[in-house]
Amino acid sequence: MSKITEKSSKVNSEWRSICPITNTLDLLGDKWTLVLIRDLFLGKCTYSEFQASPEGIPTNILASRLKRLLDNNVIVKEAYQERPVRYAYILTAKGKALAPIIKEIVNWGLKHIPGTDDKLAKEYLKKNKRSAF
């Protein structure tokens, strides 16, 4: 087994590791980010729609997670109203590439977590069957 040395494993200063699991979890693995990704796949795209999700994301956390997803090109924002300026958040190709992962998380939750909301999961799978998978 090869030993990773400091010279051979220069880490981008933005990330704390060269491990793809660690870095993916740093980007997506908190309590709220995957809920936002789910909502985007379900067709929600505005700040107020994200706030209306049943999980009740606090506004400061919502703003922070949207910024992180924007900064990492997982989503883009487009103005849909000029006065006052309002934005729609849209998955990029990079964001849409998460679809099979989200699908597997949904399926795993349905199988292994009692009381999982079948209706929401089925809505997700149905909405994303055509375009994302």
For each of these PLM feature ranges, what is it?
Residues 3, 67, 89:
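A positively charged, amphipathic N-terminal helix/segment that binds anionic biomolecules
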Residues 1-28:
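N-terminal leader segment of winged-helix/HTH proteins
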Residues 100-133:
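Amphipathic alpha-helical dimerization/coiled-coil segments
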Residues 29, 81-105:
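Basic, amphipathic "hinge/linker" alpha-helix immediately C-terminal to the N-terminal HTH DNA-binding motif
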Residues 48-84:
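Canonical helix-turn-helix DNA-binding module
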Residues 19-61:
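N-terminal helix-turn-helix DNA-binding core of bacterial DNA-binding proteins
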